[in-house]
């Protein structure tokens, strides 16, 4: 996890300078993405490869992790544009953050930030899933970056989709803060795009539930500000 400054104006004498981020706060007027992985899903869903299935959040976790929602509500810029994916777990997570003190905001559904589509393999148990693979799985992901399930996507496909989405949003919302409640695979794909690394390399990043990853786009050049920051911890 990498620590990062919060968003807002820098006090006099504490400005970021040159190419460095060394002030307590991030400067305004930067095209900045605040990527949040959705909260923990319910127990039955965690027993299978749910991919893009629309599974609900864990109700007990919603209560137990209330301090994390409050920390995110305080951490995020107050004037950000909000985006979720078509799956209810991202909408529910966004709602919980807003209810925890951020305040109600309109959200825009962005399909380009969906999780990896596992096609015919979705819904398989964790024990059954490896039997379907044609390639060795990634050490930190159920399948390699090149593995493409029947009717689904490879992580290489996800990286291309997410990269295109980020470029489009950066062009549509220049110099604005954007909160994107998304998924672990999609956030790894965003890092792959920002760092120009392979899908397999990006899968080495840990992206935990409710973690925050911040990316910036400066005239088409991407910077990673923080990865897998856990709110309130």
Language model regions located:
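Short beta-strand scaffold positions
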Residues: 84-85, 160, 181-182
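Short, active-site-adjacent cap segments at secondary-structure transitions
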Residues: 42, 89-91, 115-116, 186-188
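Phosphate-handling substructures
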Residues: 100-163, 216, 226
